[in-house]
């Protein structure tokens, strides 16, 4: 049975941990507000750019642009994985790494078996996980979210598109956490390249009569790199917001668990103290009776 001193030490340790988790929750909440605002602000631009491409692609033969071209055989795949730099965010990293692993070993098992899967990892956690397991890493971006910059998104998008244009890969897939709400980030695995020109209904509804100068094909050539960079940037912002939400929830849960543990320890402490007092009183009474006897 634990002594009073042991229980006091545990209570002190739990209180210290509770203070840390509570502070981390508050920091994550402040960061979440900023990250959420940035992610939400990026969505309309990315969405409208995608709509504009759908509208333009209805006016031209998209097969003339290699970024629209679907390869007859997919032999080489580039997987872009976005994780966090730090832990203490619940299952945020574990779940997205599992999805990336599943994407590689199930969706592209044949390509992986022939050495046809390479990766770009944004975020320390994913980078370290796959580096330790000797996956083919084209580029890693550890500690990228400590100072999140559009230049990194641009570099990743340009690297992926150049690899696709040179025929080094036949498909580019991005795996990330999309921010939906504080309680429920959504795991996503999407094809980034080749770019889909939109389904028939989207083309029909992309609407109206527009005049394009100099011509739709030339505009598409300019917009495609912007579209890819914007999508990668949006994905990184979404992941950052989802990370802060996951960390805030994890620290809130840890704080509540510490509170419950303190309650249990205090009960144990009071019981042990009461037992010690009872024992002392019994010894005093026994001693008094022995003297009187």
From Swiss-Prot:
UniProt keyword Cell membrane, yes or no: yes
Coiled-coil residue spans: none
Top-level taxonomic group: Bacteria
Disulphide-bridged cysteine pairs: none
Biological process (GO), any one: proton motive force-driven plasma membrane ATP synthesis
Cellular component per GO, a single term: plasma membrane
Pfam families: ATP-synt
Membrane topology annotation: Peripheral membrane protein
Entry's localization field: Cell inner membrane
GO function terms (MF aspect): ATP binding; proton-transporting ATP synthase activity, rotational mechanism
Keywords for the protein's UniProt record, in alphabetical order: ATP synthesis, Cell inner membrane, Cell membrane, CF(1), Hydrogen ion transport, Ion transport, Membrane, Transport
CDD domains: F1-ATPase_gamma
SUPFAM superfamilies, per database record: ATP synthase (F1-ATPase), gamma subunit (SSF52943)
Function text: Produces ATP from ADP in the presence of a proton gradient across the membrane. The gamma chain is believed to be important in regulating ATPase activity and the flow of protons through the CF(0) complex.
Similarity comment: Belongs to the ATPase gamma chain family.
Self-association and partners: F-type ATPases have 2 components, CF(1) - the catalytic core - and CF(0) - the membrane proton channel. CF(1) has five subunits: alpha(3), beta(3), gamma(1), delta(1), epsilon(1). CF(0) has three main subunits: a, b and c.
Designated name of the protein: ATP synthase gamma chain
Organism: Chlorobium chlorochromatii (strain CaD3)
Designated gene of the protein: atpG
